């Protein structure tokens, strides 16, 4: 009995890397480093703020441009980092292609809608 190894090699060559893994890996690490730095600011902001009233925090602390920009960066980068991580988990553990693609689209839409809602809530002057 002769086994055809050529067919197995062709299958392996055609299902290779899409060459996007290193870029994705780098983005995940960069967003993680940015989140670590933003976490230091967020902890400092939380511990130094003695006001328990959210209205006072919104009126005084979030009027400072640095705090607004830092909070915006923290939320946007954390959602982007979560989107990258969830995509990897979905791609690794969901084998059914239609379900995998649907879940990736749902996660991306959720992150985009959440970012837009946060920006609108942050800058809404109502």
From Swiss-Prot:
Binding site residues for heme: 81
Cell membrane keyword on record: yes
UniProt xrefs under InterPro entries: SQR/QFR_C/D, Succ_DH_anchor, SuccDH_FuR_B_TM-su
Principal place of residence: membrane
Periplasmic membrane side: 46-68
Residues annotated to bind a ubiquinone: 93
Gene Ontology cellular component annotations, sorted alphabetically: plasma membrane
Cofactor(s) essential for the protein: heme
UniProt entry keywords in alphabetical sequence: Cell inner membrane, Cell membrane, Electron transport, Heme, Iron, Membrane, Metal-binding, Transmembrane, Transmembrane helix, Transport, Tricarboxylic acid cycle
Pathway as given in its UniProt record: Carbohydrate metabolism; tricarboxylic acid cycle
Compartments in which it is found: Cell inner membrane
Gene Ontology terms, MF aspect: electron transfer activity; heme binding; metal ion binding
CDD domains according to UniProt: SQR_TypeC_SdhD_like
Biological-process GO terms, alphabetical: cytochrome complex assembly; tricarboxylic acid cycle
Pfam family, one: Sdh_cyt
Subunit text: Part of an enzyme complex containing four subunits: a flavoprotein, an iron-sulfur protein, plus two membrane-anchoring proteins, SdhC and SdhD.
Name of the featured protein: Succinate dehydrogenase hydrophobic membrane anchor subunit
Organism: Rickettsia conorii (strain ATCC VR-613 / Malish 7)
